């Protein structure tokens, strides 16, 4: 049996499961876009191209999309003509979380259930639907969170391996959290209305009109640092990064990829520099009053940022210097100046 691939947190995976489907997140970054470039405009963003590349490579037979943005709508149109899929469907969801948006989403869910059930030759299994909801298990204690646009399984795995603290993937589809409807709902129509409300009531993605709920992703007492990922030519998440750069008191690293695996070694270097900033700076051992410090380093192509925090997450010093000819040398100079400003040393 072929799995049904999906890309978006608003995909009703529990409904598809209740109709006999096996849902798999399409989250792999290709090596290149040699196939997608043959059928898509060169300016299509890397995420859209990665979807096309995966389908055209022949490993996907069933795909459910959500109209997240113009790129996904374009990808859907291209796949209708060139994808040769057994099942291709796109949900049309509005950008609000209540009112008419819930009614519209309910209609979309009912239409999808009819189309998918006809394709599979199955009927809705209420018990399987309710059993498909899984409670979220967020990290507790000090941790680093990856925010922004999806970064792909390979890049996230590398991020986990390089960073010194437990790392949580809260990008895009990976912060999905859908509450289970009331099992006492009398009929399928009422159940789908509750389900639509739960889907739209998740922590919003950047396509939604009201994005204030996204603060839950970083207003966390255990948050020790943030890696913020964006995709080249995608504007949605750049605005949030600009806001967080001003608001966050924890170390922040921005990464940008093009949707392929080709830039991963360059990103590895930046992640390694960021990880070094979490090495605990030991103060002289004076007994119970001894205090630890943390330094975060973000070495970019033009500037290098260093921030030093105490164990209570208070900023002790912050320095921004031109990176210069060598990233490692620029990071060392910036760290030395930040330590001097904080009255500390690396010993």
Task: For the regions a language model picked out, list residue spans one by one.
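Phosphate/pyrophosphate-binding loops at sites that engage ATP/ADP/AMP, CoA/4′-phosphopantetheine
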Residues: 335-347
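An N-terminal assembly and electron-transfer interface module characteristic of large anaerobic redox
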Residues: 1-294, 312, 324
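Short, intrinsically disordered/low-complexity patches at protein termini
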Residues: 277-278, 329, 339-342
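Short glycine-rich, Thr/Ser-proximal phosphate-binding strand/loop in the N-terminal lobe
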Residues: 297-337
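A broad structural signal for short, well-ordered beta-strand segments within beta-sheet-rich domains
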Residues: 167, 315, 346-347
């Amino acid at each position: 049996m072929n799995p049904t691939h999906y890309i978006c947190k608003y995909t009703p995976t529990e409904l598809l499961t209740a109709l006999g489907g096996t849902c798999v997140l399409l989250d792999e970054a290709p090596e290149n876009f040699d196939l997608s470039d043959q059928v898509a405009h060169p300016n299509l963003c890397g995420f859209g191209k990665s979807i096309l590349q995966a389908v055209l490579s022949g490993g996907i037979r069933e795909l459910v999309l959500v109209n997240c943005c113009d790129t996904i709508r374009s990808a859907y149109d291209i796949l209708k003509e060139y994808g040769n899929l057994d099942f291709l469907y796109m949900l049309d969801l509005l950008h609000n979380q209540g009112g008419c948006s819930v009614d519209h989403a309910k209609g979309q869910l009912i239409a999808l259930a009819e189309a998918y059930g006809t394709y599979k030759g199955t009927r809705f299994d209420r018990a399987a639907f309710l059993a498909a909801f899984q409670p979220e298990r967020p990290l507790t204690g000090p941790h680093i969170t990856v925010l922004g646009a999806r970064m792909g399984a390979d890049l996230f795995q590398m991020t986990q391996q390089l960073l010194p603290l437990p790392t949580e993937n809260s990008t895009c589809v990976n912060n999905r959290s859908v509450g289970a409807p009331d099992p006492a709902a009398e009929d399928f129509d009422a159940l789908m209305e509750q389900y639509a409300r739960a889907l739209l009531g998740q922590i919003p993605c950047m396509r939604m009109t009201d994005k204030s709920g996204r603060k839950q992703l970083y207003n966390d007492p255990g948050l020790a640092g943030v890696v913020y990922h964006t995709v080249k030519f995608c504007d949605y998440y750049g605005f949030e990064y600009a806001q967080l750069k001003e608001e966050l008191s924890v170390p922040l690293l921005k990464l940008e990829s093009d949707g392929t695996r080709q830039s991963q070694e360059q990103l590895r270097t930046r992640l390694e520099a960021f990880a070094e900033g979490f090495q605990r700076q030991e103060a002289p051992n004076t007994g119970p009053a001894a205090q630890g410090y943390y330094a975060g380093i973000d070495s970019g192509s033009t500037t290098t940022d260093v921030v030093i925090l105490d164990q209570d997450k208070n900023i002790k010093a912050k320095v921004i210097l031109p990176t210069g000819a060598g990233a490692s040398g620029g990071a060392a100079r910036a760290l030395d100046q930040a330590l001097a400003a904080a009255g500390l040393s690396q010993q």
